[in-house]
Curated annotation (Swiss-Prot):
<dbReference type="GO" id="GO:0003723">
    <property type="term" value="F:RNA binding"/>
</dbReference>
<keyword id="KW-0150">Chloroplast</keyword>
<dbReference type="GO" id="GO:0008033">
    <property type="term" value="P:tRNA processing"/>
</dbReference>
<dbReference type="GO" id="GO:0008380">
    <property type="term" value="P:RNA splicing"/>
</dbReference>
<dbReference type="Pfam" id="PF01824">
    <property type="entry name" value="MatK_N"/>
</dbReference>
<comment type="function">
    <text>Usually encoded in the trnK tRNA gene intron. Probably assists in splicing its own and other chloroplast group II introns.</text>
</comment>
<comment type="similarity">
    <text>Belongs to the intron maturase 2 family. MatK subfamily.</text>
</comment>
<dbReference type="GO" id="GO:0009507">
    <property type="term" value="C:chloroplast"/>
</dbReference>
<keyword id="KW-0934">Plastid</keyword>
<protein>
    <recommendedName>
        <fullName>Maturase K</fullName>
    </recommendedName>
</protein>
<dbReference type="GO" id="GO:0006397">
    <property type="term" value="P:mRNA processing"/>
</dbReference>
<dbReference type="InterPro" id="IPR024942">
    <property type="entry name" value="Maturase_MatK_N"/>
</dbReference>
<keyword id="KW-0694">RNA-binding</keyword>
<dbReference type="Pfam" id="PF01348">
    <property type="entry name" value="Intron_maturas2"/>
</dbReference>
<dbReference type="InterPro" id="IPR002866">
    <property type="entry name" value="Maturase_MatK"/>
</dbReference>
<dbReference type="InterPro" id="IPR024937">
    <property type="entry name" value="Domain_X"/>
</dbReference>
<keyword id="KW-0819">tRNA processing</keyword>
Amino acid sequence: MDEFHRCGKEDSFWQQCFLYPLFFQEDLYAISHDHYLDVSSSSRPMEHLSSNDQLSFLTVKRLIGQIRQQNHSIVLFVNCDPNPLADRKKSFYSESVLEALTLVLEVPFSIWSKSSVEGMNECKSFRSIHSIFPFLEDKFPHSNSILDARIPYSIHPEILVRTFRRWIRDAPSLHPLRSVLYDYRNSPENLQRSIIVVPRVNTRFFLFLLNYYVCECESILFSRLKRSSHSRSLTHGSFPQRTHFHRKIKHIIIFSRRNSLKTIWSLKDPKIHYVRYGERPIIAIKGAHLLVKKCRYYLLIFRQFYFHLWSEPYRVCSHQLSKNCSSSPGYFLRVRMNPIFVRTKMLDELFIADLITNEMDPIVPIVPIIGLLATEKFCDISGRPISKLSWTSLTDDDILDRFDQIWRNLFHYYSGSFDRDGLYRIKYILSLSCAKTLACKHKSTIRVVRKELGPELFKKSFSKEREFDSLPFSSKAAARSQRERIWHSDIPQINPLANSWQKIQDLKIENLFDQ
């Protein structure tokens, strides 16, 4: 596969026209077979791995020949499984062939994505100690409205196959993809017409399908937004499984005065900003309310025209950007804008300019966070910690790891806030709730748990030194972070609190449109 990648980089003819012969490569199915056994062996005991888990390459060739018939009324791979009554998702042949199909389709997509990233000089992503707050500081104060557009995952199989034809000219290589998509649509779990892209199905094929679908939506949308925007540039960024960060981009215009030899620099703010975290795209717009309505209408028409699907109106909702609060990556942030008065004086005393700018001071929203903790049964509505009864069946290490993960995510997100008193109040609630959960599990008291498990138990998970262990700072930087506002975001996945908050917001939006 690596050799084919190198050949594809040298000659685009290979990457677009000769994918179908790869389906008859025995090495390809050997790779997918080994990968399937590795995944299945990690999820089930060794005694469940039968001797029937062996791939017959002759059967695979016959399967590919039958795919050319395109009989979508027959469920694919059922006749090949040693146990026809087994679930199709757990079928050995379906998983192996699906893995091979994903490997073949990833070849042109990976080559195209690498070439597009290498050629994109306007905006490059990189890891930083700063979180999404630079985006909020630089972009949101210059915008007055935001569009929260959830990506629709309901799409017809044929439309999805036709989008692949834009990048893959080898038509026979798309026959297996078409058969798999129709097979999934006709399965007993999905007796609907167009439910295909499922973001929560943790398989390689559907993750690749989701990434391609989102990339296709954004690539077309960016080109249209750049044409419709009055600004020459459109800043955008994506925050998938891990949080990636983008450099602060400032568009500078240079002009000079005839009567002065000095050069004056002024900033030109783009009018449309796009950021996506997972499946939640956010578009920040600067303009009148009519422009916001046009953008919302354009997004709905765009999805209907290019993907032939109807999006519910609540999936693209517009909000007036508040000056004291904002929400991003599933978290809630309260902001205090402090005006700063700056006076500038030129050396030759030609003129004196007074500038008034706003400084964004984030504040920990203690009341909404306590409300979320109460919803997840970590405390009551007044903020008094209680035991998490649903976690008492777990081991002590699992309980500590879950509480520690929630605390570290919240600390990394809100550590740059102006006032940390509310943040350490959240730490007190989580640590005491963890102690009560362990005491409830062992049917004892908090004092007995501390005495039996040791005083170092909670210091390991909730210690103040642990907060800076994962920060890429030196000891001086760690000490300086005590008094300076430094953000560090290392959130591989959204914790249950953020998911709970997002569900509450979705219900509010749906109820608003139902009325």
